[in-house]
């Protein structure tokens, strides 16, 4: 009688284990479909750019087709697309600087302080009207880029949590979900309701302080610039450190749990325990491969999403630096102050954009590198 009971329990255990393996296979297929839908959530322009570098899907084989030449070609193409407005504005600014220097050099009446002040104000106003609106557009474009990237990450996070759970990293998935949802929601809300108005106010202060020496806001502008950059750097450092520490702790916990599960299967399930343990390990390996493909795809997608905004900021910084250099060569001082102020705003926008992109990329990369599978 006891022998029959043992045989019945063994058969029931085998059926449950085989059913679990079959269910896991179906779940893996559903996860693959969810990962493939990430491509559809991107904008048409980003899809086109991803395909231009050889990425048609989050499949690991498609990701391996990315080449250095295709990436450089995409960067050059984006540079040519985003350089027209900054270079056109720079040409106008350089023309104003040259006219200012000519009038200052060849007209004796301009040696009077009041007339020279009028010329300085007029030149600064001309440069202001040329630069302010494009810089405001640059700020708005960067905020839109950050919002789009945050929304994409919010679509990706539940998929990655499911992958982590099925690969034996349930604790890591829960930790990642809580941190990243908070980060993405916070970045999206702060970008539209705080960062964008703050940058526009900062630009207004910089312009006001450069038009006339009677409104001396340069110290305030310098302080705002330093505070913004230090806050961004501090927040990014704390977030990255928190992600790393929690990732290391949860990965160690998940690794012990997975080893305990495999040990239990191989030790307490008779006859086929060792085979089921190896099957469990194989399923984990396939899910880890899916996780790596999804993570690398998201990193590439985030980089492509941020690429136009980052290149625009770099081109603007180069153009403004070129104008400042020419202004210093020909000896005009007041317009140079305006150019320095606008350049400070653009560099702040660039720092914010790069830091937010880095947070998304680092958090995704940590999931790939930390706990590369419950071995």
Predicted regions span which residues?
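Mid-bilayer segments of alpha-helical transmembrane spans in multi-pass integral membrane proteins
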Residues: 121-134, 153-170, 190-198
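Residue-level signal for the membrane-embedded core of alpha-helical transmembrane segments
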Residues: 90, 94-98, 126, 130, ...
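Gly/Ser-rich, low-complexity
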Residues: 1-97, 101-120, 133-144, 148, ...
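Generic multipass alpha-helical transmembrane bundles of integral membrane proteins
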Residues: 176-297, 301
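Interfacial loop-to-transmembrane junctions
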Residues: 330-350
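Extended, low-complexity, charged alpha-helical tracts
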Residues: 152-159, 163, 325-329, 333, ...
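Membrane interface segments of multi-pass transport proteins and intramembrane proteases
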Residues: 108-113, 212-228, 327-336
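Helical hairpin unit composed of two closely spaced alpha helices linked by a short loop
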Residues: 292-333
């Amino acid at each position: 009688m006891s022998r029959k009971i043992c045989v019945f329990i063994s058969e029931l255990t085998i059926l449950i284990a085989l059913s679990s393996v079959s269910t896991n296979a179906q779940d893996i297929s559903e996860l693959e479909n969810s990962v493939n839908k990430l491509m559809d959530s991107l904008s048409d322009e980003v899809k086109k750019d991803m395909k231009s570098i050889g990425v048609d899907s989050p499949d690991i084989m498609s990701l391996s087709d990315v080449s250095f030449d295709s990436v450089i070609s995409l960067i050059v193409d984006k540079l040519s697309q985003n350089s027209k407005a900054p270079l056109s504005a720079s040409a106008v600014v350089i023309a104003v600087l040259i006219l200012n220097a000519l009038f200052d050099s060849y007209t004796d009446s301009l040696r009077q302080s009041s007339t020279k002040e009028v010329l300085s104000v007029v030149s600064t106003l001309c440069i202001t009207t040329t630069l302010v609106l494009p810089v405001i557009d640059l700020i708005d474009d960067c905020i839109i880029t950050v919002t789009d990237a945050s929304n994409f990450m919010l679509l990706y996070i539940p998929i990655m949590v499911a992958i982590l759970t099925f690969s034996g990293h349930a604790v890591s998935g829960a930790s990642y979900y809580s941190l990243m949802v908070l980060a993405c929601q916070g970045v999206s809300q702060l970008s539209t309701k705080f960062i964008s108005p703050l940058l526009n106010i900062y630009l207004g202060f910089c312009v006001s302080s450069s038009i006339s020496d009677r409104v001396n806001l340069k110290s305030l502008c310098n302080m705002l610039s330093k505070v913004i950059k230090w806050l961004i750097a501090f927040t990014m450092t704390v977030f990255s450190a928190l992600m790393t520490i929690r990732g290391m702790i949860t990965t160690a916990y998940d690794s012990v749990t997975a080893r305990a599960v495999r040990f239990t299967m191989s030790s307490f399930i008779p006859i086929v325990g060792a085979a089921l343990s190896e099957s469990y390990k194989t399923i984990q390996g396939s899910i880890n491969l899916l996780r790596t493909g999804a993570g690398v795809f998201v990193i590439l997608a985030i980089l492509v999403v941020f690429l136009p905004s980052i290149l625009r900021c770099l081109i603007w910084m180069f153009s403004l630096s070129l104008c400042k250099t020419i202004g210093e060569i020909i000896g005009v001082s007041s317009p140079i102050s305006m150019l320095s102020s606008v350049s400070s705003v653009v560099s702040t926008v660039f720092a914010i954009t790069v830091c937010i992109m880095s947070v998304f990329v680092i958090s995704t990369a940590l999931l790939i590198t930390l706990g590369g599978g419950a071995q």
